[in-house]
Each structure stands twice: as structure tokens, then as C-alpha cells.
Amino acid sequence: MSKIKVLVVPSDRTGVGKFRSVDPHIFLQNQYPNDFHVDIDYEPNMDDLNYWSNYQIVHFHRTISPDYDKSKDFVEVLNMLGIVTIMDLDDYWLPTKEHPIYPIIIQHKIHEKIIANVKAAKYVSTTTTLFADEISKMNKNVVVFPNAINPKEPQFCEPTIESNKLRVGWLGGSSHLHDIMFLEGLGHHMESHKNDAQFYLCGFDIRGAVTEINKDTGEQTKRPIKPHETVWARYEEIITNNYKLVDSSYKTDLMKWKEFEDTSTWSDSYYQRVWTRPVTSYAKNYSKFDVSLAPIKNHMFNRMK
């Protein structure tokens, strides 16, 4: 019996690509090596139909091509070739106006193009039953595969570091400013506990660019972002009560916007900035704290998660 050949087209090389596309299919092939052969291609040649015709299943996340305008039509071509197309979707197609990429999504009508992909795909996989119910209004062939990890992966096996302090942490991405704002005022309440507690802000990142849109022409220009402009700087202001919970020398070091060569210098301080790490090791940061916070606003985009 010949193996079923599966082509996986991840959306990125970070968290979504790893946990929604790459890891599940590596697991599939390892568990059923006699039944499935999996190839992972981040940049498949869209013009070579002979290449795509080698596969019985094509799995993609959100869009099969970086060019959203071509995605729906290409999925329909694959369908006509008898290839089973599976679209994975982990986020609601239209974030709120608070989301940093909302203006770009609206300008380029990306939400409409994602919906078109949902309708075109033979099957859709998603993360929650709530989201599946929403997707089923446009494609009845929807299946829930909850977000999951491999508990045997080394980064998830780190023992919690011992401490005589109560350590609270937040580990996440750059689109959660209005969720983190729920913690405003926390710093004020922690003033009397800063000697026997710590807060770890994990994922700190000053890389990236600012996209500026000309309101009159719609023209977009990009420039490198300045450290103090990043959302991470805003997160830090909220967590530290505008740096009132750190002494002046520590604040001076923080404002250099660099990782400390000697991490022990401020290791006993209430606030701990933990810089971003690769997707293969970032979860090790959970070993640094005892309580993980996940504040989240109640709106359509977040409810689907």
C-alpha cells in the first residue's frame, strides 16, 4: 500500500508554524510511518503544478500563498486536481481596532480574503469549538484540533527554579497591550511586597519596524522602531508602575535596552525583564516563576482563542 503524501505549508517559522503546522505533522509521520509521508515547504513554487500533484493532501495555515489575492484561486485549482486541501486557522479573521495590524487588515481587506480561503478549502481545522461554530457558517467541514504541546520536548521539562519569593510571570507576544492594561495598578499594590515577590515579563523584544500610513494617499512607509516606542516598553511601564518599583540605578540599566552581561546584578529585584528567545526554547522561561498570568479582554477576537 502506498503512503499518503502530505505537503505542509506553514505560515511562519515561529510559534504558529511550529505548533499548528510543523510539530503535528512530524508527530503524524512518526506515529504512522507506513501510512504517511510528510514534506514541509515554507516557500513552495506556486507555478509548478507538477510539484503539487505529487501530494494527496495539502495543509496550509490561513493562506497558501503570501499573496492573499492568489490564495483562494490556487486552492480551487488544487481541489480540481483532486488534492484534499486543509486550511488551519487559529485566529478570528478580524481583530479589534486595538490590534496593531488592524489598519493593514482593513486597508488590504485581508479578513475578506481569509474568509474566501475558508470557503474554498475542502476542510478547515481550528483550535476551539466556539471558533469552529463560527467557521461552520461558511464551511461545514470543520474539525477542532486544540492547541497542544509535546510534554516531552525539553523546553517544557525544565524544573521550576527554587526561590523564597513568590514569582509571578507573563509570557506572550506583542499584540496584547490592551490585555496587559488590566494589570494597571498592580504595581501600586505590589509596593509593599516588592521585597518578597517578583514579576517576570518574558519575551521582551525591541526588534521590528514601524509602518506609517499616509492618511491622504494610503502610502505605507517603514522605519526601524525605537526601543522606547515598542509595545514592550509600554508593558514594562505598566508592570513597574512607571518604574517606581525599581531603583534609579536599575532603571538606568534598563534604559540601555540591552541584555545584561551579568544577570546576577539585578536578579533579586522585584521586576525581571526576560528577553525574547527562539520558539524552540522560549518555554524554558516558565521555570522562572510560580504563577502565570494571562489577562485577556472579552471580545470576539479573543473569545475564539
Task: Give the role of each language-model region.
Residues 1-65, 212-214:
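N-terminal pre-catalytic "stem/leader" segment of glycosyltransferase-like enzymes
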Residues 55, 121, 289:
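An anion/phosphate-binding loop that grips the pyrophosphate of nucleotide cofactors and donors
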